[in-house]
């Protein structure tokens, strides 16, 4: 029969060997999470009041409608708008900032969500002072044409149950091509 000392040594070795897969899984999870955060930072290139997403070929306004880009951040009060008001503002932005500005699709706006962050669930370095609530998309709900999709940056969820006359925040986007 093996001595107590040998049995203890064997038990310790077995515990280490059994714990190794869990340790590896934990480390791999940390690496993946870190890589995802780095990829998000690399995907969005900041340029003053704009953020370019080269992967999806989009250019975002860093500030919500109502805010202005000043001193390297978004300042001012975010305007809560109906869909009709958002479309009017979008037309004004196209005139003043060049063509192409529009309300994002639900998929485009959902792409800005950072699931592992606290509210607001968005890269706050790229999109400072973001409203911790719902933002309009240009997509109507499939239930009825009176509902539109929104993306909520407090919860990180999408909703298709907001009436067009309700007021939400707006962040505009346009297609971007590299010349």
Predicted regions and their residues:
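Bulky hydrophobic/aromatic "packing anchor" residues in well-ordered structure
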Residues: 57-60, 136-137, 172
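Bacterial N-terminal signal peptides that target proteins for export
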Residues: 12-25
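An exposed tryptophan-centered "aromatic clamp" motif
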Residues: 87-100, 106-155, 161
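Boundary at the C-terminal end of the N-terminal hydrophobic targeting segment
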Residues: 36-41
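Short, structured beta-strand segments at or near domain termini in extracellular proteins/domains
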Residues: 161-179
């Amino acid at each position: 029969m093996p001595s107590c000392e040998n049995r203890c040594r064997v038990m310790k070795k077995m515990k280490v060997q059994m714990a190794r897969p869990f340790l590896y899984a934990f480390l791999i999870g940390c690496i993946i999470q870190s890589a995802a955060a780095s990829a998000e930072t690399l995907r969005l290139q900041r340029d003053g009041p704009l953020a370019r997403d080269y992967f999806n070929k989009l250019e975002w306004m860093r500030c919500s409608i109502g805010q202005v880009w000043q001193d390297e951040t978004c300042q001012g009060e975010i305007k809560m708008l109906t869909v009709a008001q958002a479309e009017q503002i979008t037309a004004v932005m196209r005139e003043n900032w060049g063509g192409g500005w529009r309300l994002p699709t639900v998929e485009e706006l959902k792409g800005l969500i950072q699931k592992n962050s606290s509210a607001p669930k968005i890269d706050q370095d790229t999109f400072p002072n973001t409203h911790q609530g719902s933002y309009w998309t240009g997509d109507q709900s499939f239930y009825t044409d009176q509902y539109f999709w929104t993306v909520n940056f407090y919860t990180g969820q999408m909703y298709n149950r907001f009436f067009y006359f309700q007021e939400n925040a707006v962040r505009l986007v346009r297609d971007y091509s590299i010349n």
